[in-house]
Amino acid sequence: MWYVSTRGIAPRVNFEGALFSGYAPDGGLFMPEELPQLDRKTLCQWSTLSYPGLVKELCALFIGSELIPKDELNDLIDRAFSRFRHREVVHLSRLRNGLNVLELWHGVTYAFKDLSLSCTAQFLQYFLEKREKHVTVVVGTSGDTGSAAIESVQGAKNMDIIVLLPKGHCTKIQELQMTTVLKENVHVFGVEGNSDELDEPIKTVFADVAFVKKHNLMSLNSINWSRVLVQMAHHFFAYFQCMPSLDTHPLPLVEVVVPTGAAGNLAAGYIAQKIGLPVRLVVAVNGNDIIHRTVQQGDFSLSEAVKSTLASAMDIQVPYNMERVFWLLSGSDSQVTRALMEQFERTQSVNLPKELHSKLSEAVTSVSVSDEAITQTMGRCWDENQYLLCPHSAVAVNYHYQQMDRQQPSTPRCCLAPASAAKFPEAVLAAGLTPETPAEIVALEHKETRCTPMRRGDNWMLMLRDTIEDLSRRWRSHALNTSR
């Protein structure tokens, strides 16, 4: 399986090449050159698989066995999920009035990113040990990515991780999950800015191809293909858990409601749809509504500023993975995609061509949900089910309630729940409810923290480059000492 850039200029790479890249050298994102097609028979066979079983099948489709033999791939995936709290890894809660909530948050950091990042870290370690190499992972986070990335690679001998977090823009628990990890391969910076601002120095550093190559830099943000690949399993599992029967022709549709920030989960769902999964995708966003405006009006443009909302991990203005969706919608036309994205990077505003917009609105429905609607949804779900939603999950469930109240004809529907309510006590209190906090999260309050400030007025890019160069020097000196 080969991977090509959405912008069509960078040379194609295999899975290992895509895994170790953030952006492609031409600024695009890697995508499979050809998508496999799943027939009815395969879908019927997969319908009885567990969540880890689905991850194994999907990864085997997109990672050649010449790179990772199937038995070894299965072992890596089992190892990735070994620390999850739920025996199913992912669990579907069936609640009143047809509300299905797929809990993607049973990993160590109580967020869905544990699923894709734990697998991605295993794949990285596999190749690094084989090649006797070291990488420095650079991550910008709006909340959950940083802690899940740190958790997945902390203590790894072939990897260092640098995380930039937006001070004051993620919850106290999210921040503590990052700053209390004191392993020597973990380096956390608290940035005086929002998540889009802290992405700028990262993007600038990654644009220096020679620097990236010299220091073996990579990203674990949602642009990494491996994360999108694993996230496809959410949609397959949601489908098989919620479909009424496989006996009908054609196979029944299931609506999957995807709370969306950087759109990695949406891209995964759209690829799942393209390879044969009969899902209808609903993008649910908070007040940062660029994707909603794109779906409704073809208006892919920045607002004046990021809005702080209760669903803080989705407070994102630039949903990078939409580039993957545009590329697929355009029939893998890299010229169209490159022109769109370069205009967006230049002017922060693009009106989608009519044909592209029409294809997008056929493939995806969207909804934007206010903070008031988030807290109302959390309250209603508790009243009806004694079930606590996190604010991001409430964005998805709000769509379900809207459809139910309008008495729309009922397609089976699954709402993805990206995080546990335990991570967002402030939002739970705002909804007039009582937070439930697990002991591991309470314990964070009493742990030692480590975090280097990046203040307004500091040269963030220079600080980042200096840290990377220092880590490279340390690794070279370590490698020299161990080879003697």
Swiss-Prot record:
It is an enzyme of class 4 (lyase). GO terms for molecular function: lyase activity; pyridoxal phosphate binding. Keywords: Lyase, Pyridoxal phosphate. CDD domains: Thr-synth_2 (cd01560). The modification N6-(pyridoxal phosphate)lysine is found at residue 113. SUPFAM superfamilies: Tryptophan synthase beta subunit-like PLP-dependent enzymes (SSF53686). Gene3D superfamilies: 3.40.50.1100, Threonine synthase, N-terminal domain. Transmembrane segments: none annotated. Its EC number is 4.2.3.-. One of its GO terms (biological process) is serine family amino acid catabolic process. Disulfide bonds: none annotated. Its cofactor is pyridoxal 5'-phosphate. Acts as a catabolic phospho-lyase on both gamma- and beta-phosphorylated substrates. Degrades O-phospho-threonine (PThr) to alpha-ketobutyrate, ammonia and phosphate. Belongs to the threonine synthase family. This is Threonine synthase-like 2. It comes from Pongo abelii. The lineage of its organism: Eukaryota, Metazoa, Chordata, Craniata, Vertebrata. The gene is THNSL2.
